[in-house]
From Swiss-Prot:
Alphabetical keyword list: Cytoplasm, Kinase, Transferase
Gene3D superfamilies named in the record: 3.30.420.40
Family stated for the protein in its record: Belongs to the FGGY kinase family.
GO terms assigned for molecular function: autoinducer-2 kinase activity
Function: Catalyzes the phosphorylation of autoinducer-2 (AI-2) to phospho-AI-2, which subsequently inactivates the transcriptional regulator LsrR and leads to the transcription of the lsr operon. Phosphorylates the ring-open form of (S)-4,5-dihydroxypentane-2,3-dione (DPD), which is the precursor to all AI-2 signaling molecules, at the C5 position.
Species in which this protein is naturally found: Escherichia coli O139:H28 (strain E24377A / ETEC)
Entry-linked CDD domains: ASKHA_NBD_FGGY_AI-2K
Gene: lsrK
Extent of the signal sequence: none
Protein name: Autoinducer-2 kinase
NCBIfam families hit by this protein: PRK10939.1
Enzyme class: transferase
Amino acid sequence: MARLFTPSESKYYLMALDAGTGSIRAVIFDLEGNQIAVGQAEWRHLAVPDVPGSMEFDLNKNWQLACECMRQALHNAGIAPEYIAAVSACSMREGIVLYNNEGAPIWACANVDARAAREVSELKELHNNTFENEVYRATGQTLALSAIPRLLWLAHHRSDIYRQASTITMISDWLAYMLSGELAVDPSNAGTTGLLDLTTRDWKPALLDMAGLRADILSPVKETGTLLGVVSSQAAELCGLKAGTPVVVGGGDVQLGCLGLGVVRPAQTAVLGGTFWQQVVNLAAPVTDPEMNVRVNPHVIPGMVQAESISFFTGLTMRWFRDAFCAEEKLIAERLGIDTYTLLEEMASRVPPGSWGVMPIFSDRMRFKTWYHAAPSFINLSIDPDKCNKATLFRALEENAAIVSACNLQQIADFSNIHPSSLVFAGGGSKGKLWSQILADVSGLPVNIPVVKEATALGCAIAAGVGAGIFSSMAETGERLVRWERTHTPDPEKHELYQDSRDKWQAVYQDQLGLVDHGLTTSLWKAPGL
């Protein structure tokens, strides 16, 4: 590829659009991976009256917000638009956008849309109850979060939209389309539709045929880091970028986050600690779990896939605990000029490993085929205030998050035979030094903490740089730009103690699931169709 710019031209920058579940960000980086400026706005998804579980994506409003963020980032950086060498977009996975035959976006839903529960159940019965298994073996996805039941819901309930639909993309692709007018999907994000073959990294239209759905709506597939087009004059007026700026194919947020962390080689492993915690392991070739407990997604690195297990609401649970029970600590932390979590970790560091036997019941390990959780609770509390207090419960939550991660990584090892020698811990959770050490002690693995902990936008910027000809390789650039802050080494004695805690927690959790099964308690979350 001919180079449009060279890294020595230090005036040039890269822009990443990061479309998360709750917000949109435009982030500007220099060519050494340093974040220069950001523009950010929260967005809200639309619940449709009388459609339980619906969460539609507001195309018009959210495009306005994206444009405002791009203008804000440029303003905050104090740079002229002509110095943006390229732009790319990443997004939450599973969210889809439909277009009519004139190219106008006509409908979209967010990743959290769960309206199609009945359709999931119907689809599971196809082919003598083997359809979901066929989907999983080919694509690494089950039906619960895939596009197939959502399309079937539209065919049943919004036939006007279904008949008009000419093309389907992901939300990251929609952003690129709004900038360039070019429609395409990339494997890493489109892989979460349950319609993309893991081996070929291309659509598998036979799955739509099997479901009785149209197979003529599938967009061209282009790899992450491919030049898609350029910013149109119309888009330039709205977003502030210069017309003609290269627009590059982006991808899924987790996979691009791994690129930004340098997790680009087979067997490399990461725990991404945000609202949800993802445990991901790179696999050199497609392989799926015979038990269907783990999802498998295309990596942004061609030919590679990622086994991914998800811990539910881990970061959200910590925020709930802080806001519900720690008003005093929030005030003290504010007076001290520190983060509340830092103060809570200092308190929790004085609690012995094992947290006096307290067992939080929140997220289960991932069971992709039958994915649901027990009712939130704390088990084995005591009425001794010296042993059972806020510090103990906070440490117990951190330990439990690490235990669930270790269980998820073990599930991946069981079918992939990949046993990592270390892991990367990133996201907001990795800011906690105690939490990072607990993860090392529970997993028994050295835990490496990067300087840039929110790496999704950086990975997206790397893709933009490859598409613009600035960087020659995504993998090599990811490895070159990542910098490490610290490493946590596991304590063998604590690891042995946590092994016992893990075994007890798994047994107790199974009993708690039984209470949900008997209708006595309410699940933290259930996948559509269960």
